[in-house]
């Protein structure tokens, strides 16, 4: 779809959406996003120019259907997929991608660390994906030196980062905010460092006693991203991995650095979003969102959850969707889904489905709470169908029509029950929605009440 849009830009020194927006240009991607979001195109351009919105759209991802992440647009949901050395393969990951897109993922991150040739897995995912693809390049950098962290060099990181850009990756998690002086701050934590990428960088710094190479070479990464329009997703290496560690000095020190890096990238017209926690008690979620906006000059916030309790392994799609809905309400731009398998293992297709639906609910609830124009239209339409006992329309309007139909069919599978004025909960005689109050009923009631009032 984008080949003709991109052709005139190829070979230019800076092809980012932010670069064009700051020149006053409304790109085809911005216009496409405006129509998807039902917002004015000049508003999209202005938000991208300001840095409050990103359109992750690598020039080499030509089959992408552009979307926006930002405070002015709908709250988005990311799904993580990826093969591991112990489970999954390229075909399974492409199927997970298709399932994620089917159930509403706005972006997908390929977090593959094994299970085959990582370049082939990534290429297959990008070629099959109409949504933006994100990656964490430090995983492949480590794989390129056979897991020997001490052998990693800055050039190894930069080589992998550029390779991902060449393949068409739309945004990359860059763990540049973790500084060597931050490491002592994790001493008082229960769970230390829980970011895989952050853990790799921390081990590298501890071995070499040198500053984070992604930080010292940040401007080199900027130069790479400019040529492809790859967006930064600045990784929060020190995100809290449990409630005890939330909002601590380690997390907030890194956040301050992430804000500084955001502004450096903006100086070169490179798009940025900032990643956030994690595990956060409900009473600290608003603080975390407000603090990120303050430190990072309102760059879009992209949070993992957050989980609001640590005691529910197997149900962390629920514990985190609670926090995600609150974070979205307070202004988070994108929510990274958590599956029921979180902390326990690699998610399968059903886990992806359950995690995504939980997060589509959270994002939609946030849009309603933020009074986004039209956010509640679908809810109202489904409610009217429910009141009219239009079961098929209810199914069609559901976030997961297959699951809604499946549950109805468990007790009332026959077609005749798809027009019945009851379900198996109340049965045919006790459903309160059978009580239809007409205009005529209300008119008669008003007359009675007026008469009764006069007599009193």
UniProtKB/Swiss-Prot annotation:
<feature type="binding site">
    <location>
        <position position="302"/>
    </location>
    <ligand>
        <name>substrate</name>
    </ligand>
</feature>
<feature type="binding site">
    <location>
        <begin position="195"/>
        <end position="197"/>
    </location>
    <ligand>
        <name>substrate</name>
    </ligand>
</feature>
<keyword id="KW-0411">Iron-sulfur</keyword>
<dbReference type="GO" id="GO:0009228">
    <property type="term" value="P:thiamine biosynthetic process"/>
</dbReference>
<feature type="binding site">
    <location>
        <position position="109"/>
    </location>
    <ligand>
        <name>substrate</name>
    </ligand>
</feature>
<dbReference type="InterPro" id="IPR038521">
    <property type="entry name" value="ThiC/Bza_core_dom"/>
</dbReference>
<dbReference type="InterPro" id="IPR037509">
    <property type="entry name" value="ThiC"/>
</dbReference>
<keyword id="KW-0479">Metal-binding</keyword>
<keyword id="KW-0456">Lyase</keyword>
<dbReference type="GO" id="GO:0009229">
    <property type="term" value="P:thiamine diphosphate biosynthetic process"/>
</dbReference>
<feature type="binding site">
    <location>
        <position position="80"/>
    </location>
    <ligand>
        <name>substrate</name>
    </ligand>
</feature>
<dbReference type="GO" id="GO:0008270">
    <property type="term" value="F:zinc ion binding"/>
</dbReference>
<feature type="binding site">
    <location>
        <position position="343"/>
    </location>
    <ligand>
        <name>Zn(2+)</name>
    </ligand>
</feature>
<keyword id="KW-0862">Zinc</keyword>
<dbReference type="GO" id="GO:0051539">
    <property type="term" value="F:4 iron, 4 sulfur cluster binding"/>
</dbReference>
<feature type="binding site">
    <location>
        <position position="423"/>
    </location>
    <ligand>
        <name>[4Fe-4S] cluster</name>
    </ligand>
</feature>
<feature type="binding site">
    <location>
        <position position="426"/>
    </location>
    <ligand>
        <name>[4Fe-4S] cluster</name>
    </ligand>
</feature>
<comment type="pathway">
    <text>Cofactor biosynthesis; thiamine diphosphate biosynthesis.</text>
</comment>
<feature type="binding site">
    <location>
        <position position="175"/>
    </location>
    <ligand>
        <name>substrate</name>
    </ligand>
</feature>
<feature type="binding site">
    <location>
        <begin position="236"/>
        <end position="239"/>
    </location>
    <ligand>
        <name>substrate</name>
    </ligand>
</feature>
<protein>
    <recommendedName>
        <fullName>Phosphomethylpyrimidine synthase</fullName>
        <ecNumber>4.1.99.17</ecNumber>
    </recommendedName>
</protein>
<dbReference type="GO" id="GO:0016830">
    <property type="term" value="F:carbon-carbon lyase activity"/>
</dbReference>
<comment type="function">
    <text>Catalyzes the synthesis of the hydroxymethylpyrimidine phosphate (HMP-P) moiety of thiamine from aminoimidazole ribotide (AIR) in a radical S-adenosyl-L-methionine (SAM)-dependent reaction.</text>
</comment>
<dbReference type="Pfam" id="PF01964">
    <property type="entry name" value="ThiC_Rad_SAM"/>
</dbReference>
<feature type="binding site">
    <location>
        <position position="279"/>
    </location>
    <ligand>
        <name>Zn(2+)</name>
    </ligand>
</feature>
<keyword id="KW-0784">Thiamine biosynthesis</keyword>
<keyword id="KW-0408">Iron</keyword>
<dbReference type="InterPro" id="IPR002817">
    <property type="entry name" value="ThiC/BzaA/B"/>
</dbReference>
<keyword id="KW-0004">4Fe-4S</keyword>
<feature type="binding site">
    <location>
        <position position="431"/>
    </location>
    <ligand>
        <name>[4Fe-4S] cluster</name>
    </ligand>
</feature>
<feature type="binding site">
    <location>
        <position position="275"/>
    </location>
    <ligand>
        <name>substrate</name>
    </ligand>
</feature>
<feature type="binding site">
    <location>
        <position position="139"/>
    </location>
    <ligand>
        <name>substrate</name>
    </ligand>
</feature>
<dbReference type="GO" id="GO:0005829">
    <property type="term" value="C:cytosol"/>
</dbReference>
<keyword id="KW-0949">S-adenosyl-L-methionine</keyword>
<comment type="similarity">
    <text>Belongs to the ThiC family.</text>
</comment>
């Amino acid at each position: 779809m984008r080949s003709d849009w991109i052709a005139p830009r190829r070979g230019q020194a800076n092809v980012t959406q932010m670069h064009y927006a700051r020149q006053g240009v409304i790109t085809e991607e911005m216009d496409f996003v405006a129509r998807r979001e039902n917002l004015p195109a000049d508003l999209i351009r202005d938000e991208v120019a300001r840095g409050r919105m990103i359109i992750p759209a690598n020039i080499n991802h030509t089959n992408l259907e552009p979307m926006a992440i930002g405070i002015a647009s709908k709250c988005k949901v990311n799904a993580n997929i990826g093969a591991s050395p112990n489970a999954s393969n390229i075909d399974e990951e492409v199927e997970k991608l298709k399932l994620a897109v089917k159930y509403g993922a706005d972006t997908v991150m390929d977090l593959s660390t094994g299970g085959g040739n990582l370049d082939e897995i990534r290429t297959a995912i990008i070629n099959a994906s109409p949504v933006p693809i994100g990656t964490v390049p430090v995983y492949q950098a480590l794989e390129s030196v056979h897991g020997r962290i001490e052998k990693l060099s800055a050039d190894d990181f930069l080589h992998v980062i550029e390779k991902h850009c060449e393949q068409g990756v739309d945004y990359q998690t860059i763990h540049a905010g973790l500084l060597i002086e931050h490491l002592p701050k994790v001493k008082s934590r229960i769970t230390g460092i829980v970011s895989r990428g952050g853990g790799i960088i921390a081990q590298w710094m501890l071995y070499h006693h040198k500053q984070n190479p992604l930080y010292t070479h940040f401007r080199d990464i900027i130069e790479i991203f400019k040529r492809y329009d790859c967006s930064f997703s600045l990784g929060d290496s020190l995100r809290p991995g449990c409630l005890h560690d939330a909002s601590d000095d380690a997390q907030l020190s890194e956040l301050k650095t992430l804000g500084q890096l955001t502004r450096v990238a903006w100086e070169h017209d490179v798009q940025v979003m900032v990643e956030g926690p994690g595990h956060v008690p409900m009473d600290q979620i608003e603080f975390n969102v407000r603090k990120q906006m303050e430190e990072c000059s309102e760059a879009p916030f992209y949070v993992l959850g957050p989980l609001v309790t640590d005691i529910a392994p197997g149900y962390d799609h629920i514990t985190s969707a609670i926090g995600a809905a609150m974070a979205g309400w307070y202004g988070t731009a994108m929510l990274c889904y958590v599956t029921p398998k979180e902390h326990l293992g690699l998610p399968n297709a059903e886990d992806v489905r359950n995690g995504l639906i939980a997060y589509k609910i959270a994002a939609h609830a946030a849009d309603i709470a933020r009074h986004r124009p039209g956010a509640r239209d679908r809810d109202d339409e489904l409610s009217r169908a429910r009141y009219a006992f239009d079961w098929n329309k209810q199914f069609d309007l559901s976030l997961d029509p297959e699951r809604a139909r499946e549950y109805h069919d468990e007790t009332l599978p026959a077609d005749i029950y798809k027009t019945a004025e009851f379900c198996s909960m109340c049965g045919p005689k006790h459903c309160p929605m059978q009580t239809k109050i007409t205009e005529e009923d209300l008119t008669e009631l008003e007359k009675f009440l007026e008469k009764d009032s006069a007599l009193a």
